[in-house]
């Protein structure tokens, strides 16, 4: 069996090696010729999987190591009898930790205001549960849910009136609830003074031109963008206006990536009728030094902020993206290639649950907060 896989998917050989011959290729430039002789195709969100890529190929199974599936032409795949699978929830924890890291970098105490979430699926739902467990006043907009599923559901207008807004919707262009440009000029005008807007879902859910126009006059609004419209050739003007910008890496924790690979491996084995041999728990490398320094802090908010910054310095992601923009503006590089380079060579970021915190007796009040965030308190 021949397997073609995106070169940026970790542990592909370790998981899929016993199933067949593996060819690893750049996902964004994958062509029909590249996959013509493949039986299995393993991709990420940068590879559009449709008739143009697969018509005339031998591919019978497509796996995407991502939560989102807007890059798959699902109707065409099903029409052709090509099985496909995604990895829902694989990097939800990673994205939620990105949101917390962004708030810490902006020095935003999330208890001091109302928090709005747009899209309460795997990612938004996890963020919702963590915030509620910390005592945050949360409002959610998701037309696909009922009040029985989430008692804090409300209108989009009510969510847009919150102090902090985090967006986690898939990109949907058809059906009853399309999300393309869900937040545009009219919605941005509803943001309250001093609002924080985070988009770590899909770039085109926010009208990026309307957002740029808004930020040019609304200097009180601070925006965090991990996803852009379009990618990889994002608006450098918009990058200059946002408080934090990153190259679509919110879900790029090493743990999240490995979860995605493992989920697609399991689905592939099931599809071809082979018993799985690889086990994620045996492949994940342990951290050598996972005890964090509390710096003598004892109160929940200052201690949480200090620990999060130790584990994940989101400012470094922002700085690397802006450095690529400066190189492009100086004519020393092509920005789109630089954007992809940052994603391909992203540092190994481990999630909070890999780290231990030794609490003093004076810091016991912070135990619940830190446990909700995922840290292991000892």
Curated annotation (Swiss-Prot):
Source species of the chain = Cellvibrio japonicus (strain Ueda107) (Pseudomonas fluorescens subsp. cellulosa)
As its record notes, the protein acts as a catalyst of: 4-phospho-D-erythronate + NAD(+) = (R)-3-hydroxy-2-oxo-4-phosphooxybutanoate + NADH + H(+)
Signal in keyword set = no
Which Pfam families does the entry mention? Answer: 2-Hacid_dh, 2-Hacid_dh_C, DUF3410
Question: What is the protein's given name?
Answer: Erythronate-4-phosphate dehydrogenase
List the NCBIfam families hit by this protein, alphabetically.
PRK00257.1 (NF001309)
Transmembrane portions of the chain: none
| Top-rank lineage group of the source organism | Bacteria
The record's annotation in HAMAP family points to: PdxB (MF_01825)
